[in-house]
Amino acid sequence: MFRSRRRRNVHEWAVWTLVEDHLESPTGEEFVRTYVDSPGAVGVVVVDAESFDALVGNDLGRIGTVLVSQYRAPFGEVMWEIPAGMRDVVDEPAELTARRELAEEAGLVAEHWRYLGVMASAPGITNSTVEIFACCGLREVEVERHGPEEDHMEIRRLSVAEALEECRRGHITDSKTIIALQWLAELV
């Protein structure tokens, strides 16, 4: 069994911590790994329908969804993604964070919510996970953007089939978005 022998916080910023972890392998070998400790995030795949019943037996080309564009500094480009955000409010339940992010980024509130699952973002460099929710029964509200990336965010409505095709063509490369759309497709 692998064991952590000692951890040291190298740097802290916002809600993240860069951690240096001194480990021991099952054979007693000692080694060091550095990773980003994160509170995690949420993602919301929008279903443009009154209820989840509309998904059953339906064609993915007839089911609408919503994506938002956001500039991502590590890639130096704008990416299309599902509405999402950090779990940056201490002790806030994941679904409440998802509801808040949906309103802030897409200007939507939803009546019905379903938890789809959790994914590890990049397990070699961070312990961050993304909890994915689906929602439907939509109502528009005023968008509450925070920060320069969100100030320049665009909202795009398209069918789930179109979004999945954008993933296959490499136009959507964000992992949480690809996984969320695949999980949503499994509900049909």
Regions found by a protein language model. Name each.
Residues 4, 18-20, 32, 68, ...:
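Hydrophobic residues on conserved beta-strands that form the core of alpha/beta folds
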Residues 7-53:
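Acidic, metal-coordinating catalytic segment for phosphate/diphosphate chemistry
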Residues 36, 43, 54-100, 149:
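Conserved Nudix-box catalytic region and its N-terminal flanking loop in Nudix hydrolases
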Residues 18-20, 45, 67, 132-134, ...:
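Conserved hydrophobic/aromatic beta-strand scaffold that supports enzyme active sites
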Residues 40, 62, 71-73, 81, ...:
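Active-site segment of metal-dependent pyrophosphate-handling enzymes
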Residues 26-27, 48-52, 71, 136-140, ...:
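Short loop segments at secondary-structure junctions
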Residues 2, 7, 78, 115, ...:
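Nudix hydrolase/Nudix homology domain
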